[in-house]
Amino acid sequence: MDMAAKFQDQTVFHMTGKRAGESLTALTTGFRPALLAPYRDLTRLRYDYPVVLVEGDASREYVRSLSSVVGGLIAELAPRGIEGERLRKQLLRLERELRVLVADGTTGLLSDLWPEAAARAAGRDDGARDVLTRAAGALGIDGEVIDCSRALTERLVTRAWKSVNAEKARAFRLLVDHLIRKLSDILRAAFVHSQAGQQPQALKSGFGDLHRDTFDFSAMSKLVTRNVPKDELPAKRRQRIEWALAVLRSQPFYPGSRGSGAKGEPYAFEFDNCAAAIEAHRARLPRLVELVKAIAIAELEARGGYDEADHGPFFERYDEHALTADDLAQFPDYLVCIPADRNGAPENAAMMEMLSAGMPVKVLVQHGDLLEEAAIGQGHFAFGVRSARLATTAMGLGGLFILQSTSSNLYALRDRVRHGMGCRGPALFSVFSGSPDAAGNLAPYLSAAAAMKSRAFPAFTYDANAGTNWATRFSFENNRNTGDDWPVEEFAYADENVQRVNEQLRFTYADFMLCDQRNAHHFAVVPRERWTTAMIPASDWLLLPENQATDRVPYVMAVDGSDKLHRVIVDARLMQATRRCLLLWHRLQEHGGIHNSHAEQALAREKAAWQAQKEQELEALRKAAASATPAAAAPAAEPVAARAEAPVAAPTEAAPAPSSDQPWIETIRCSSCNECQNINDKLFGYDGNKQAFIKDLNAGTYKEMVEAAEACQVAIIHPGKPWNPNEPGLEELLERAKPFMA
């Protein structure tokens, strides 16, 4: 009897998720994917965490890994060669003790933790303790030491925001201080040359104490007042300058400017919910408009360029609609860090609207749970989408910087995080910070790394300002094997005969779900003696046609608490979720230019056309050779001539491509941003998947088609040639349409 037929309980479990009898055992606490077996004690590894959140705003390097800090210290203090080996080992031991301290929950500055770690690393060696303690003086930096915990994400992102904000503050204060000084000089000069400035007491105050008794200031006043101009500073100009000075000195956006006289507390820009940030922005907008207006007037007055006739009417009507991107870029962006347990709260329901409106805000959305147990069509999701789809949905809004990552990858993306904080306009940071405590005892770093590795939460960035196409805007960030469905790792283990076996394992979404003990009911452990030929790795099972997959049982490799290797079969429900995860990954791959369906179709058409052309050339050569006579003077010349005269198959005959003369839309790539429908909803329509197509050419103009192509965030609208030759302005429109031609 076939072993696969004998153990039908495995097939039953896969199909129903129910264990029959005692041959299959439940997945208990302590099981983890086989590829995570070597990482039970992270304190023994030198990797990116913990990190030091560097204090001070002078440096753009706002975060450093502990390993890089100690590595720099070794390079600076330890001599090269054998004589520096002892100090190198001592510093590496100290680094490990720091890592252990932080893993045990100890918090504080690096300078505070260093002495205790030095004492632990040195043990009873007082000399080593002194050396390690003195080494702290060469650190050159200090800051909070924090592990890859659930608290890391908000602190690291906030530190990046503060680093960017400090640069803005320095530039703004320099500008405001310069303008205050210039306007003050104008008023001071006007006063000195005025009647009041020529009075004896005013003249006396302008002299130092040493010579005050030497001069007769009353007589001096009579002499100088003869040359005082009759026209003092015009009243309107004086009033305008004094108003601008008062606004500049009292501005609450960047306290600490020259002559600052701001009343009340300076504005705070850090919030934990969207509603509060929106309310603050609206309340402060009039004050911001007033300050921008004052800066503009001050700059004109400082260079003597203010013209009452030209500038007066403009500034009288100056309001929030006159603000430009350059104006807003001078001020702090709002930072909204939404706690992981408040994503679905009412005060955060307007997040998407806030981002699409272009408000100067940076939003951090933290995800603490990727478990999706809701039935199809049921359940409530924060912001209306599942966690892993929030960032991809936001890409359709246009004009944003978007970063999706796990906390384990944040340090590697530190420069991208800071870049996003410095971008003009809104930005979204969507970060998975590790599974909750209820998921099991897997360290947050491993949980986050597993989510990224399994494609459950891949890392990418989207920068709308980086260029005009997906190649410049979208970037995968540190995902393994981006061209494959699943990342592949070499796995070594000992078989039942204690012989080394090397095997390549793929880390799938099912492996990630195995890390969460709340998913235990989706798995069943199979004893080695019951392994059958019907069992197949989950990654391979997903590649099978449906009629073949029903006869096979998918499994993943796992280890228990004692590192014993097991096969764990997966039920159909979780495999469906794994397939959905893979589908989303394929969509991301297309955004990144990997396995792009349009490119592959175009390549297939070109290959077919090339093959058809070669076949015709060969056929022409064969015919020419068959018709050639032995007495021909130049038999070799005929095939060449025949080849030149042979008809060549047009590429379009193999597989017709969209003509560049006809308007068309790459519907499958549509992000449902509504830009085209906002222009003309009769010309453009949505199909059942809410993706755009051309509904009726006669319902619109070529101008609307070109405008839609220019507005499309994913550049999928190709205007083709005008269908109405009498439409005005076609020459200009054709020039604008060139970048979007197929």
Label the predicted regions:
Residues 1-324, 331-337, 446-650, 725-726, ...:
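Long, compositionally biased, glycine/small-hydrophobic-enriched stretches that function as flexible linkers
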Residues 330-346, 361-364:
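A short, small-residue-rich loop immediately preceding and capping a beta-strand
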Residues 348-349, 353-389:
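Catalytic or ion-translocation cores adjacent to nucleophile or general acid/base/metal-coordination motifs
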Residues 368-370, 409, 432-437:
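Glycine-rich beta-alpha junction loops
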Residues 664-680, 697-715:
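Cysteine-centered iron-sulfur cluster-binding motifs in ferredoxin-type domains/subunits
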Residues 688-700:
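Ferredoxin-type iron-sulfur electron-transfer modules in oxidoreductases and energy-metabolism complexes
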Residues 699-703, 720-739:
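Polybasic, low-complexity binding patches
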